[in-house]
């Protein structure tokens, strides 16, 4: 499952594998799991914040840039299976690729270990990481999204 989570579509295309062998479906699932867990986290951490502000804050927390930051902290790029062309053009460091891989990893953790393990991973390596590095945007910054 982990190998599937780090397999980019460029690698699958280059190796003439089935499209389903890349991480895109796991990314889809991981995105949904991340949205649910981050929503729950914000709901309980910001009990007086109105719904619109919670939505903006969540969007800023799970955006490509924030997830890419967390992926860099985990050195996720070094584990990616990329096609030669994608690798040669800096794909390991591209925010869109690393953030997608992080969502795929969340999807894999959810499928393999269940909701509780996915939640533990997200709290430890994404939500707490973002708080510790001041990436949680204020409502003014979220308005700019």
What function would you assign to each model-found segment?
Residues 1-140:
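Double-stranded RNA-binding/processing signature
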């Amino acid at each position: 499952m982990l190998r599937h989570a780090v397999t980019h579509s460029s690698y699958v295309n280059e190796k003439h594998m089935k499209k389903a062998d890349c991480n895109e479906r796991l990314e889809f699932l991981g995105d949904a799991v991340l949205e649910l867990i981050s929503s729950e986290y914000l709901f309980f951490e910001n009990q007086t914040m109105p719904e619109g502000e919670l939505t903006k804050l969540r969007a800023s927390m799970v955006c490509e840039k924030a997830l890419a930051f967390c992926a860099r902290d985990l050195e996720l790029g070094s584990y990616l299976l990329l096609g030669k062309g994608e690798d040669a053009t800096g794909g390991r460091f591209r925010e869109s690729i690393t953030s997608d891989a992080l969502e795929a990893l969340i999807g894999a953790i959810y499928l393999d270990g269940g909701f509780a393990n996915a939640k533990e991973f997200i709290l430890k390596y994404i939500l707490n990481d973002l708080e510790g590095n001041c990436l949680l945007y204020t409502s003014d910054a979220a308005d700019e999204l």
